[in-house]
Amino acid sequence: MLHTLPHCASGVDFPALLRLLKEGDALLLLQDGVTVAIEGNRFLESLRDAPITVYALKEDIDARGLGGQISDSVVRVDYTEFVRLTVKYANQMAW
């Protein structure tokens, strides 16, 4: 399943998101959600042991001036790769 997070993590039920993550899922951070990808962010730390891949939309990272602060554990994607993720994961959950 592809989970999308367009908000700051404090604005969603993050414990529920963590509970629903399954092996092989992906979490795509976009809009203000890219702040989760900042190195040392407590929400990112809670994702470290999850059996998922965390992606962040590069354009949103750049728009917020966060390029140098993003964790190396987060995969940066552009809009084309965003579309590929939506095709790859038939099921999606928007937070």
Swiss-Prot record:
Enumerate the InterPro entries for this protein. Answer: DsrEFH-like, Sulphur_relay_TusB, Sulphur_relay_TusB/DsrH
Question: An example Gene Ontology cellular component term from the record?
Answer: sulfurtransferase complex
Q: Supply the alphabetized keyword list.
A: Cytoplasm, tRNA processing
Q: Where in the cell is it found?
A: Cytoplasm
Q: Does the keyword tRNA-binding apply?
A: no
The family database entries (Gene3D superfamilies) matched by this protein are listed as:
DsrEFH-like
Q: Which one GO biological process term can you cite for this protein?
A: tRNA wobble position uridine thiolation
Q: Name one Pfam family in it.
A: DsrH
Similarity section: Belongs to the DsrH/TusB family.
* The protein's role, per its UniProt record: Part of a sulfur-relay system required for 2-thiolation of 5-methylaminomethyl-2-thiouridine (mnm(5)s(2)U) at tRNA wobble positions.
**Quaternary structure?**
Heterohexamer, formed by a dimer of trimers. The hexameric TusBCD complex contains 2 copies each of TusB, TusC and TusD. The TusBCD complex interacts with TusE.
UniProt name for this protein: Protein TusB
What organism is this sequence from? Salmonella paratyphi B (strain ATCC BAA-1250 / SPB7)
Gene symbol of the encoding locus: tusB
